[in-house]
Amino acid sequence: MEDLIKHQYSVGVLCRNIGIYMGLSSKEIELLETAAFFHDIGKLFVPKSLLNKKEPLSIEEFELVKMHSLYGAELLKKIGFDSTVVSAIRHHHERYDGRGYPDGLRGEKIPLFSRIIAAADAYDVMTTGRIYKKPLPHDKAIEELIRYSGTQFDPEVVKIFLKMFKEEKAYV
C-alpha cells in the first residue's frame, strides 16, 4: 500500500510538471494532478497476491489486473469526481498505437491527461522498480521512453518530458 501511495504521488508530481511545461491552465493542471494521484486507485480492488506476484502473470491473472483502470474510473465517477479525471484514469493504459486497454483507443483519441499519465507512470515504474523487476537508471528509462515514442507513448508528450528533464525541472 505504501508503495502505491509513493508511486501515485511521484506520478502526480511528474504530471504536474509536464502540465506546466505544456502550458496547461491552472485548472487543467489541477485536474491532471488529481487524475495522476488517483490513477491506480482501482488496484485496491485487485487481489494483492496478483499485484505482488514475482512470477509472470497468467493470461487470466493479467486480465484481472487490467481491470484496475475500470475499477478506479467507476469508483471516482460514483463519488463525483470531474469527468475529465474519470476519463484520464480509465484510459491511462491505452497505447498511442491503439494496442492498449481497456478500449483500444489510438493517438489523439486517447485523452491528453491519459497520454501524460502513461509516460509519467512508465518512467516512475522503470526508475523505482517493482517486486518482479529491478529499477533502471534515469538515462535508461529515458531511452525506453524514446524507444516507445509513437507506439506506446504520445511522441509530443515524450518530447516535452525530455525537454523538461534536460532543463532539470522535473526531478521528484
What residue spans do the PLM features occupy?
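Histidine- and acidic-residue-rich, metal-dependent catalytic cores
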Residues: 1-172
